[in-house]
Amino acid sequence: MSNEENIKSDNKSGDSSDLPTIPALDIGAEECDLLAELKNLTLKRPFDVKKLSPKVTKRVLFLKDIQVTHDELEEKFLAEKSALEATYDNLYKPLFAKRYEIVNGVVEAEAEKEGVPNFWLIAMKTNEMLANEITERDEAALKYLKDIRSCRVEDTSRNFKLEFLFDSNLYFKNSVLSKTYHVNDEDGPVLEKVIGTDIEWFPGKCLTHKVVVKKKTKKGPKKVNNIPMTKTENCESFFNFFKPPEIPEIDEVDDYDDFDTIMTEELQNLMDQDYDIAVTIRDKLIPHAVSWFTGEALVDEDDSDDNDDDDNDEKSD
């Protein structure tokens, strides 16, 4: 006897009084056709409400009214949230300005005029995500980093810009390296465009490329054998952050099928990683830089992860 037959047999012989009573569904032919069509529904073929019965149509329209009200409230919430964030961004600015002065020795704060050496480099390397992006070659250039700032591009949008302020150094001419993120909010937050600074490297100082020396054996006398050949290749560097992945413009693509083809999984992963790094800098590093410098933020983050694990364990129990 199969498991299914055993179950049926047990149900017949057992007391049905302790089984939950399931109300019968009054489904007519029209509703059956509706369920079949909904099952085969695709995003490219929206369901026609006119095919419903008058009673069900009335209910669906009422549900749509509820959804409209919800969307209006959500839009109001996001606007008020954006305004509140803008207000507090302005309150934070004087504090970040004082931090800049102390880190860079502009004011004494009962310390030496040299400020806090390698403040931002150490703070960044304490964060695991950022540390993974920084190579040993990068460190010499990042020692010239004076400040990292975040600002809104437009007060009522999710667009934001990160600015890295550098002292005069031996690596590049730019005093500021920036990265701007444009987010489309019309149909939910979608990363639309990312713009990074073109770094003006001094000759022989580019950290995003490396020169590879190869030996090419040439036929002939021994004196001309093993001629050294040089080749420039891309290499890992934090400064690749300012050269973001290129996002295809939707307007330039014929339809969403073509867009999905262009947006390969690899490109999507690169975009996600790039955005995660930017948000980490904006939401974690900049507001709590001194805690990352001292390592306290790392301890707090570990404690937060432990609490999340405990909460998950309780839910599973």
UniProtKB/Swiss-Prot annotation:
Top-level taxon of the source organism: Eukaryota
Protein's UniProt keywords contain Nucleus: yes
Residues spanned by motif Nuclear export signal: 52-67
Any Gene Ontology biological process: double-strand break repair via homologous recombination
Cellular localisation: Nucleus; Cytoplasm
Family: Belongs to the nucleosome assembly protein (NAP) family.
Note on domains (UniProt): The acidic domain is probably involved in the interaction with histones.
Role summary: May modulate chromatin structure by regulation of nucleosome assembly/disassembly.
Protein's name in the database: Nucleosome assembly protein 1;4
Gene coding for it: NAP1;4
